[in-house]
């Protein structure tokens, strides 16, 4: 996998853990409205790939290379929860700007990561 290809747009993961969202009870509706508005803007701009939230009511399952299945995720890794959005953007600066918009809407910091370039995916 190539780390970056400047000739094509990169996909960026914008995410947050559930614990990052400290929202007073009366503000949840506004947060949802604002977050959906930013996602709608990303869709209208043609940069939205997909997104969602981890269903914390369904426990993870670890499937080994030999096909063995075990309840729970990696024992040494922190639990994966919260929400995420994947956007396809022409620059890191634009990714930072979208992450800032999402952070403002969600009322919490967002982690920004870039996917490595794989010409076969």
Model feature map: region roles:
Residues 2-121:
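Conserved, structured core segments of small domains
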């Amino acid at each position: 996998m190539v780390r970056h290809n400047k000739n094509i747009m990169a996909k960026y993961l914008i995410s947050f853990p559930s614990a990052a969202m400290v929202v007073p009870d009366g503000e949840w509706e506004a947060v949802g409205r604002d977050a959906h508005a930013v996602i709608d803007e990303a869709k209208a701009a043609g940069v939205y790939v997909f997104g969602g939230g981890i269903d914390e009511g369904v426990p993870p399952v670890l499937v080994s290379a030999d096909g063995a299945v075990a309840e729970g995720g990696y024992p040494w890794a922190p639990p994966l929860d919260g929400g995420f959005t994947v956007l396809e953007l022409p620059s890191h600066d634009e990714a930072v700007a979208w992450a800032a918009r999402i952070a403002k809407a969600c009322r919490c910091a967002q982690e920004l990561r870039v996917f490595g370039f794989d010409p076969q995916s």
